[in-house]
Regions:
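Glycoside hydrolase catalytic-domain context in secreted enzymes
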Residues: 1-185
Length: 185
């Protein structure tokens, strides 16, 4: 059950009732991680349920912390325009500190996709179309999020997405991608 990952109970549009047995499954050790849990009240509640399982393996909580957690910073594309790697590392560090305080263990950031089409709806999550700048920013943001992983204010960074995800045909998210050598190189 440790590979099962569930979402939280709330979304911006209201309550989510996909799995009414979620709490019982956590107690049984059938869930290993959860996404989009908002605040220490809920992370603590779910963690206490996990400690009632036979093996007492804690849950991992993940959240998209793309440009801040409670403090909102400029979107990654705007930060990239500054070329200020120290500032980007600092904003990731602050976001990690806030997220960790809320019980979040890992973030799905930074996005390292190279944007090819301005119509793509996720351009703002990354550093744009420059591979050199994108690699430098990814390094700075991972360093900011993770710092020293022994520090309670750090969160694990998970770079995303798959190769060529940012080259979706027609700029349509989740669309086909031309992964031929000609297009990738």
């Amino acid at each position: 059950g440790q590979l099962n990952q569930y979402t939280g109970d709330n979304a911006a549009t209201g309550p989510i009732t996909i799995n009414p047995n979620k709490q019982a499954e956590i107690k049984q050790g059938l869930i290993g991680s959860m996404l989009n849990i908002l605040g220490t009240k809920y992370t603590r509640q779910y963690q206490e349920l996990a400690m009632q399982s036979r093996l007492k393996i804690p849950l991992l909580f993940g959240q998209d912390v793309i440009h801040g957690y409670k403090t909102t910073f400029p979107i990654p594309l705007a930060e990239a325009a500054s070329w200020d790697l120290e500032a980007m590392e600092l904003t990731a560090r602050i976001a990690a500190t806030e997220a960790a305080a809320a019980g979040i263990h890992w973030t799905f950031a930074p996005m390292v996709d190279i944007s090819r089409d301005p119509r793509w709806g996720r351009v703002m999550e990354g550093a744009g179309e420059d591979t050199y700048l994108g690699s430098k920013i990814a390094y700075a943001r991972v360093k900011g999020f993770q710092g020293n992983l022994g520090d309670v204010t750090s969160v694990m960074a998970c770079v995303k997405h798959f190769a060529a995800y940012g080259a979706a045909v027609g700029g349509r998210d989740y669309n086909s991608v031309d992964m031929s050598n000609r297009m990738l190189w």
